[in-house]
Amino acid sequence: MKNLDNVKRIADDIKTITIQWATNIAREACKIMEQELRNWKFESHDELSRFFNEASQMLIDARETEPLLRNAMKYAKSKLKKWENANQIADAFREYLWWIEREEDIRPKIWAEIIHNWDDVFTHCHSKSVVDILLKARNDWKKIHVYNTETRPLYQWRKTSLDLLNAWVPDTMVVDSSAWFFVDNTLWNTVDIKEIFLWSDCIKPDWTVINKIWSFSIWLSAWNSWVPLYVVWSLLKVDTTDKVWIETRSGKELRPEAPDWLDIVNFAFDRIPHKCITGIITEFGVIRPENLMREVKKHYPWMLE
């Protein structure tokens, strides 16, 4: 078996969050797989397959809930079944990287058109993709004001706010617990929210969206007050497995001195029903949730194999 030290180093960096964010994780995993496949000489297809399977599984196990990473390995494996040349498998990883870069470039240019001049926009947690759309709208000379949550316990809003303020986009932080009330224009209309943009940590085949905790309450308020809610997502990040896993955080985060016999429920994520999502903003346009798998089959059929 070929040496897997370089792959293990990247896997360890992913596991310890030295490498973080979905796109960065997938990008580094693809790069190391391409590098190692080109560097090693394989004597047979069986040897190539063993190396690929062990290396790819090591990377997947480092962040098993990350579909963009898992789909990268799935795409390359679909080519492994057809080709025997390691360089061709490496080319598959390079192609996947190109898809990621294309998606990041195309989406903000097209779907910033959803935002209109003078709109008050709301977002939750931090997402570079969401920020890119907001900055593109600003670069198109649209005067917008962004409201975003604090996003406890890691306070990702600080990154969102810094990116926006550095680009001279007016920004206001809203505490998590009042976000649902803030966005409901029927209960409190001092600020008239026009659109809500949410990132997603996972979209399932049944169109369910899994995202940072408080997303469900924000969705419920948007539904109640007819505020359009968009999920910013790439088809490459659709999780085609049936497994639904909602991450929880330690109860010690809330009460470090809590007695051992006290159970504390501390969800890190929740679920957004698909029925009132206005659209999913993808690299192929804004699509309705119920059309999600049809678009996956059309553009990335290997994901459903």
Where are the language model's segments positioned?
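Histidine-anchored nucleotide/phosphate-binding helix
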Residues: 127-139, 219
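Conserved phosphate- and dinucleotide-binding cores of soluble alpha/beta proteins
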Residues: 149-305
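Non-catalytic, soluble scaffold/interaction modules
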Residues: 54-81, 92-96, 100, 109, ...
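Glycine/charged-rich beta-loop-alpha catalytic/anionic-binding loops adjacent to active sites
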Residues: 7-16, 54, 90-94, 141-146, ...
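Long amphipathic alpha-helical segments
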Residues: 1-89
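Ligand-binding beta-strand-loop-alpha-helix segment within the catalytic cores
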Residues: 74-117, 135, 144-192, 196
